[in-house]
Each structure stands twice: as C-alpha cells, then as structure tokens.
Amino acid sequence: MSTIKEYLSELSGRRVTVIGMGVSNIPLIKLLLRAGVEVTVRDRSSRERLAGQAQELESLGARLILGEDYLKDLPEELIFRTPGLRPDNPELLDAVQRGAALSSEMEVFFQTCPGRLIGVTGSDGKTTTTTIIAEFLKEAGKNVYVGGNIGRPLLADVADMVEEDY
C-alpha cells in the first residue's frame, strides 16, 4: 500500500486517460489534475450534454475527447475505466495489447486507503446492512466513511483517512 501522495507522484510524466465523467470518476480526475498529471478524459456523451462539467475539467487542464468515437485510439499508458465499461471492450483490449495498464477509481482507493475496509455484497439489503454497520461503528466511537452506491466517492477523502478509520 502507498499513500495517495506517493501514488500520484508515481504518475508524474505518464499519459493517463479516464474513461467516463460519472460521479465516481470526477474526484479521480480532479485529484490527478491537481497533482499535475497529464489527463485525457473520454466520454460518450456530447459536449452539450456535459456542459458545465466539461468546461470545468478543461479549465483545470484536462483534454476532453467526447462523442461516439471517444474510445478510438487509446495511446495513453494508464487507463482508468468507468465501472460501466466492460474490461473486455475491444478498444481496451487493443490498448492493453499495446502495453497500457487498466485501473479504476476504486482500485486506486483500495491501494491508497490507510483505514480498515469492510465490503458488503449480495443481491438485496446492501444499503441497509452497510448503514447498520456504519451506525454500530459510529456508536463505538469510530470515524466512518461510507461509500459505494450510497454516500459519496471515497477517493476524495482518502488523504484525510488514518489507520483507525473505517
């Protein structure tokens, strides 16, 4: 495990692309840009649909590739894919064959989170179970961060987390 600062330092000078401008990838994109990483953001949506979000990321230094051909020619060395894009996508497989590495916002979080992680999986009851676990831990005086499909993307908070956190 490395700290988020160490992880970002390792990306210095590398060409990175983030596929998808959804809720979970926006904190990743901003974190990379603030660290001085050269970031290309790719999304199937049009500029009109992304409006202010596209402008904000460009003002922070991101290069945007939008529209139907957003996955054409992936020359970057590291590709962060959105959870909605299958890892066996032909364009991704081509990029990997050329030497690109695949990652995700959650993978970065798992690699850099100093706290204790609790995963909840299953078909039904995940939100309820997660909420109950969080409340039990809070009642015990623990500092708790809740992520996944409830709460907010945790990568934005990882720099503030310590080993005792959940």
Question: Where is each model-derived feature located?
Answer:
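Phosphate-binding loop of NTP-binding sites
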Residues: K72-L74, P83-Y166
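N-terminal leader/targeting and accessory segments in enzymes
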Residues: M1-S104, V108
